[in-house]
Curated annotation (Swiss-Prot):
The gene is thiC. This is Phosphomethylpyrimidine synthase. Its EC number is 4.1.99.17. Its cofactor is [4Fe-4S] cluster. It comes from Prochlorococcus marinus (strain AS9601). Substrate binds at N80, M109, Y139, H175, S195, R196, G197, D236, S237, L238, R239, E275, Y302. It comes from the Bacteria. One of its GO terms (molecular function) is 4 iron, 4 sulfur cluster binding.
Length: 456
């Protein structure tokens, strides 16, 4: 779809959506997004130019269907997939991708760390994906030197980052905000550093006693990104891994640096979103969102959860969806899903489904609470179908039609019950919607009550 759009841009020094927007040019991607979001193309261009909205769209990801992440657009959901040294199969990861897209993932991150050829699994995922693909390049940087921190050089990081860009990765988590002077602030935490990328860079800085190379070479990374229109997802290496550690000095020190880096990327006209926690008590979620907006000049916020309890292994998709709905309501632009396997193991296909649906609910609830135009239309349509006992329409409008039909059919599987004016909960005699009290009857009752001087 995008080949004809991209062709005139080839060979230019800066092909980012932000660069075009700041020069007053509405790209085909901006037009496409405007139609999807039911917003004016001019508004999309203005928000991209301002940095409040991003369109992750690498020029080498030709089968991408562009989408937007930002306060002006719908709240989005990311799904994580990826092979590990203990569980790895390229075909399985491609199937997870397809399942994630089927159940509404707006973007997908390939977090593969080993067990397969990382370039091959990434390429297979990009070739099959109509949604933006994100990666964490430091994983492959470490894998490229067989896990040996002492052999890992600054140039190794940049080489892998450019390789991901060349393959068509739309956004990369770059852990550039973690500085060597932040590390002592981790003392006193219960769970320390829980970011894999952050952990790698912390080890590198401690071993070499040098500043974070992703920070010192940040302008070089910007030069790479603007050649491909790859978007920064600035990683929060010091995100809290438990409620005790939330909103501490370490987290907020890194956030301040992420704000600095956001503005440095914008100087290169490179798109940015900023990653956030993590594990956060409900009463601190609004503070975290507001603080990010303040420090990072309203760049789109992308949060993992946050989980609002630490005692829900096996059900962390529920604990985190509560926090995600609140974060979305307060202005977070994208929610990274959490599956039931969080903290326990690598998710399988069913875990991907469970996590995604939980987060589609959270994002949708946030859009309704923020009064986005048309956000509640589908809910109202389903409610009409429910009142009219149109079971097939209810299934069709559900976030997970297969699951809705499955649960209904467990007790009333015959086709005749698709027209029945009851379900197995109340049965045919006790459903309150079965009585269908007419508006005319209610008007007559109101008139009679008024005649009796009864307040209504």
């Amino acid at each position: 779809m995008r080949s004809s759009w991209i062709k005139p841009r080839l060979g230019k020094d800066n092909v980012t959506q932000m660069n075009f927007a700041r020069n007053g040019y509405i790209t085909e991607e901006m037009d496409f997004v405007a139609k999807k979001e039911n917003l004016p193309s001019s508004l999309i261009m203005e928000e991209v130019a301002r940095g409040r909205l991003i369109i992750p769209a690498n020029i080498n990801h030709l089968n991408l269907e562009p989408m937007s992440i930002g306060i002006a657009s719908r709240c989005k959901v990311n799904a994580n997939i990826g092979a590990s040294p203990n569980a790895s199969d390229i075909n399985e990861e491609v199937e997870k991708l397809k399942l994630a897209v089927k159940y509404g993932a707006d973007t997908v991150m390939d977090l593969s760390t080993g067990g397969v050829n990382l370039d091959e699994v990434r390429q297979a995922i990009i070739q099959e994906s109509p949604v933006p693909i994100g990666t964490v390049p430091v994983y492959q940087a470490l894998e490229s030197v067989h896990g040996s921190i002492d052999r890992l050089t600054e140039d190794d990081f940049l080489h892998i980052i450019e390789k991901h860009c060349q393959q068509g990765v739309d956004y990369q988590t770059i852990h550039a905000g973690l500085l060597i002077e932040h590390l002592p602030k981790v003392k006193g935490r219960i769970t320390g550093i829980v970011s894999r990328g952050g952990g790698i860079l912390a080890q590198w800085m401690l071993h070499h006693f040098k500043q974070n190379p992703l920070y010192t070479r940040f302008d070089d990374i910007c030069e790479i990104f603007k050649k491909y229109d790859c978007t920064f997802s600035l990683g929060d290496s010091l995100r809290p891994g438990c409620l005790h550690d939330a909103s501490d000095d370490a987290q907020l020190a890194e956030l301040k640096t992420l704000g600095e880096l956001t503005r440095r990327a914008w100087e290169h006209n490179v798109q940015v979103m900023v990653e956030g926690p993590g594990h956060v008590p409900m009463d601190q979620i609004e503070f975290n969102v507001r603080k990010q907006m303040e420090e990072c000049s309203e760049a789109p916020f992308y949060v993992l959860g946050p989980l609002v309890t630490d005692i829900s292994p096996g059900y962390d998709h529920i604990s985190s969806a509560i926090g995600a709905a609140m974060a979305g309501w307060y202005g977070t632009s994208m929610l990274c899903y959490v599956t039931p396997k969080e903290h326990l193991g690598l998710p399988n296909a069913e875990d991907v489904r469970e996590g995604l649906i939980a987060y589609k609910i959270a994002a949708h609830a946030a859009d309704i609470a923020r009064h986005r135009a048309g956000a509640r239309d589908r809910d109202d349509e389903l409610s009409h179908a429910r009142y009219n006992f149109d079971w097939n329409k209810q299934f069709e409008l559900s976030l997970d039609p297969e699951r809705a039909k499955q649960y209904h059919d467990e007790t009333l599987p015959e086709e005749i019950f698709k027209k029945a004016e009851f379900c197995s909960m109340c049965g045919p005699k006790h459903c309150p919607m079965n009585s269908k009290i007419s508006d005319e009857s209610l008007d007559q009752l109101k008139d009679k009550l008024e005649e009796c001087n009864t307040s209504v």
